[in-house]
Each structure stands twice: as structure tokens, then as C-alpha cells.
Amino acid sequence: MIKLIASDMDGTLLDEDARVPEETFELIHRLAERGVRFVASSGRRYDTLRWFFEPVADEMDYVASLGTQVYADGRLLDREVFSTLSVMRLFETCQMFDCLHLALYDAGHAFLLNDQSAYVRELDKDLPDAICVFDPPSPDVSIIKASICCDRPEQIMDMAYVLERELSEWFTFLPSGSRWIDVTPRHVSKATGLEQVMRYWGIQPDEVMAFGDSMNDYAMLRYVGHPCVMANARYAVKQVAQHVIGSNAEHAVQATMRELLESL
């Protein structure tokens, strides 16, 4: 029996306008009444996720910032912070390549490292008013998220490979969309965050259904017993799916949630 549903946001749960379809809130509420928890698992930060799900924000759990912010039952279970040394290594490596543009995030700010190009406008769906800086923030700033914009989309896989070769002892690099490379500490992923939520509720992997579309969902999809992948997903992600459902534009996640609810 499914006891928990975890879903990615962009390209998965959200529609083509990056909005939560209205029926989602009722589905989360009704599933919770039947004992099925819902987890938003995303690169977006915790406060932003709560804003997206405001009508049911207190009825669900969160794996935010790609696993560095984990909340269940309203409680903070884990918060991972990038070390100052690892941030400096990441900054120095990105400076080696003219097509890479680093962004660092704390809980409420986005810092653009020495860059004022057009990518600033699409930088962070959480916080469009980003701050341009010339060096990484001071050590008293708790960095919880990093992303790299590659302004040569056709080279994104090559650049992810190069970054992995340079910094594999520190980070994992996950292409997301056509321009972005998500950066996570080596031991952190959506899967590790979800594992903590599951442990809190006493839920096993074979009791979990997860939805995703991108490489930053791969570990989570491999971890759960019932991985469902979007029709618009990356090829490699589709290969590990138990089910390939419709696209986010078709509200396929919501349709699958409704089917589960009706089967309970």
C-alpha cells in the first residue's frame, strides 16, 4: 500500500506556467485524510514551497533545496550547509570556464558571482531580485544551495562532466533543464532528504510513489518502490521508471494521485 507520495515541482507537478494546478490542494488534503503523506521534493527553497502550497502547507512535508532542507510534520529534520572551503573551490573552478555562471543561495538571498549577464533574469524562481557580488559571501552566511548556469546549452553535458572531474570529492553535478547544472554536497540528494522523512513516519521504500523528470530526481526515483516519470522527462530518467505517465502540461501527476485516492 502506498503511504507516501513525493513529487518534484518544475516539469513534474507544476503546469506549463509554473503554477500548482488547483486540484492538487484537494488531492493532498484528501490523501492525507486517508493516511497518505505528500512530500514536495524540489530545488526550490522551503519558504517558497510553503508559499506554493499555502492552502495545505501544514498538511504535507518538504525536501527543499535538493535535500539540504528537510521538514516533516512541521519539524526541521535536517539542514545541510556548504562548507566555506567547498564554496571557494566551486567558485574558483567556475571561473576557469567562460560559459559557467555560479549562483549561491542562503535561506533568503541569491548571490551572483561576478556576473551581470542576461541569465540573471531567469536565475532563481524563488528570488528574482538577486545580488551581484565579486566574491563568495563571508563564512557567516549559511549557503544551502548552489546552481550553475551554462550559457552554451549544447555543451551542458560536457560541462557537467568537467565539473564532476574537478570537484567530485566535494559535489555532485546534475543537469537540470537546458541551461542549469544543480550542485549538491556529495552526500546530499533528494533521496537522502526523502529517506529522513520516511524514517520519521516509519515508511518503507516499497510504500512510496515518487514523480520526477530530471537528473536531480534520479536518486529519489531509484530509491523508492514506485517511480513514476513524466513523458517530458530526460531519457536516462525514463529508463528507471516503473511507469511513464503523461506530461506536466497534461496534469499527469494529479491524474495519478486521483487514481490512487480512488483505489484506497
Locate the predicted segments by residue:
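Active-site phosphate-binding/coordination module
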Residues: 21-119
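Short, acidic loop-to-helix structural element flanking the phosphoryl-transfer center
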Residues: 18-34, 79-87, 128-130, 187-199, ...
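Asp-based, Mg2+/Mn2+-dependent phosphohydrolase catalytic module
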Residues: 223, 227, 231-264
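Non-catalytic pre-domain segments flanking phosphatase-related domains
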Residues: 1-7, 26-29
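Asp-based phosphoryl-transfer active-site loop
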Residues: 3-17
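Conserved acidic, metal-coordinating active-site core of Asp-based
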Residues: 99-211, 215-223, 232
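Residue-level signal for inorganic ion chemistry
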Residues: 31, 42, 146, 221, ...
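Short active-site oxyanion
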Residues: 33-39, 58-60, 206-207, 222-226, ...
